[in-house]
Amino acid sequence: MFEELKPHLIELRKRLFISVACIVVMFIVCFALRSYILDILKAPLIAVLPEVAKHVNVIEVQEALFTAMKVSFFAAFIFSLPVIFWQFWKFVAPGLYDNEKRLVVPFVSFASIMFALGACFCYFVVVPLAFKFLINFGLNEDFNPVITIGTYVDFFTKVVVAFGLAFEMPVIAFFFAKIGLIDDSFLKRHFRIAVLVIFVFSAFMTPPDVLSQFLMAGPLCGLYGLSILIVQKVNPAPKDKESDE
């Protein structure tokens, strides 16, 4: 059994090596440009709470260095995503038919675009609204907000990556439908469960406030509907199966 899996493991190692190498190279580039990247990350906070943004602090000796490394890795991961998606496709492509292999460019493009849409939605909508709500809530309770650059970057990277990955739902649905694992009737049948899972996922992946949770759950419910339409085109359920349901 191991001998049968060995070629696949070698191929997996190759694809992982290329992906990691790309991230390392991009990390070096991004670390050199860390000041510009950090300015981009702070822009949503400056836009809605300029006075608070002036007083972002560093309270630990190593915090500035660790934050710079974290920001550089975050940017490197984002810029490496097209290569990562490409390597994933190259790994699964040998098991697909020739007509399915022609989907490589649409797959990589679609996956990259959906991640970018999720990240942009988070950057321009979710992060400003969430920060404004959370900071103003603290001010209304007579708390004096002390924001460190480390906590801000942790918050920012967590929600942006979460939204980017969450927006991959139609891509995953397309892939599963293409290999025959799901059809549109499966998604329709489990719609209520999916909504529950979406809200639980949103609660874990967003800050602990209702606004952020709904800002993630709302678009995800819409993307689930889009996934149904995509799967309906790619792998529609047989008519007799639909009538039984």
Task: Mark where each language-model region is.
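Membrane topogenic/interface segments and analogous intrinsically disordered interaction regions
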Residues: 1-245
